[in-house]
Amino acid sequence: MKKQNNLRSLAAQAVEQVVEQGQSLSNVLPPLQQKVADKDKALLQELCFGVLRTLSQLEWLINKLMSRPMTGKQRTVHYLIMVGFYQLLYTRVPPHAALAETVEGAVSIKRPQLKGLINGVLRQFQRQQETLLNEFATSDARFLHPGWLVKRLQNAYPTQWQHIIEANNQRPPMWLRVNRTHHTRDGWLGLLEDAGMKGYPHPDYPDAVRLETPAPVHALPGFAEGWVTVQDASAQKCVAFLAPQNGEHILDLCAAPGGKTTHILEAAPEADVLAVDVDEQRLSRIYDNLKRLGMKATVKQGDGRYPAQWCDEQQFDRILLDAPCSATGVIRRHPDIKWLRRDRDIAELAKLQAEILDTVWPRLKPGGTLVYATCSVLPEENSAQINAFLQRTPDAALSETGTPDQPGQQNLPGAEEGDGFFYAKLIKK
């Protein structure tokens, strides 16, 4: 492998772009993976996800072992040392190889003069590892979450916040949704077994399958033909609450990448579905999913706050609003969220959610159903949001989900092995 494609230096650059520049790992990682051999892609992904998952600990260690922070053009070395710590703590990479490759990464980022520094810090960590980890275990950094988020979770869930944090720090299972228009779930599980893999049906979600071991999608029976889709079990519950019917006019708002759009059409193949998302670049993901599953829907770019951008005065039988949110329920799947979000974002997101709810509600027919969903665990975006909406919207009533005192249903991360999700089913009187 060429030196400029040193895995450790690429991982360091990816983490730096997330933490320092506010870019999402899903945007940063794919171009970097193109620079390494296929056999190395999984390790590069593991290093990036792992460092972001444990960033608080790795930062704490650097502060203990270095007298001053690295700044300016040397900042990438800061993250390269983190990659070294992560390998020594959490991977099966032999320590000598972890050190050698991490030190060599300095050459790839054109900082060869710092090889000795990197080597010295990593070896010092090896010598002091037990003492350092014992001290870390009593520090605030041990939660592996930013302090503002820990405080919000403590306030919202006084008896459950530690369980939420522990779930967020775990690796997520791989959930699939079997396309019922092609196969029964049991039938597809048989095909999976024939392919040498094992899956488990979810007891409550009729299309959901959890893989015993995560696998690349191209290895899944019939993935290219649309027999199965990658989607967390908790996300599949949105369409169960929506209960779409054939012949209905249905709006999927904030629809990208299209997982719920296609789920609606699997449940009601003859429904007339309009999928709308504000991000024009992500519309291609909706088209790709529709094409792979052999389905048709109308797809438009538009802001949920301005319905005139994407439809005329028509009303819908059902609306699924998967609202823009903090994504604090899917941290285990996207650990970069911890470092991309800021405390001030929550109030801004809650304001945006309220605006979308208020402007889309008139587009729902009397007697129609609106399902409001987020992948957040914060009450400001969930139960408090719906409570405020019900108070200012006389023709809205809660159905199936929660009580007037606690509107909506909150799934916490790890519950039934799913992501953290919130749902509120509203009926228009």
Swiss-Prot record:
Keywords: Cytoplasm, Methyltransferase, RNA-binding, rRNA processing, S-adenosyl-L-methionine, Transferase. GO terms for molecular function: RNA binding; rRNA (cytosine-C5-)-methyltransferase activity. The active site is at 375 (nucleophile). S-adenosyl-L-methionine binds at residues 254-260, 277, 303, 322. GO terms for cellular component: cytosol. Its EC number is 2.1.1.176. PROSITE patterns: NOL1_NOP2_SUN, SAM_MT_RSMB_NOP. Pfam families: Methyltr_RsmB-F, NusB, RsmF-B_ferredox. It catalyses: cytidine(967) in 16S rRNA + S-adenosyl-L-methionine = 5-methylcytidine(967) in 16S rRNA + S-adenosyl-L-homocysteine + H(+). Coiled coil: none annotated. The keyword Methyltransferase applies. It is found in: Cytoplasm. One of its GO terms (biological process) is regulation of DNA-templated transcription. The keyword Secreted does not apply. HAMAP family: 16SrRNA_methyltr_B. Specifically methylates the cytosine at position 967 (m5C967) of 16S rRNA. Belongs to the class I-like SAM-binding methyltransferase superfamily. RsmB/NOP family. This is Ribosomal RNA small subunit methyltransferase B. The lineage of its organism: Bacteria, Pseudomonadati, Pseudomonadota, Gammaproteobacteria, Enterobacterales. The gene is rsmB.
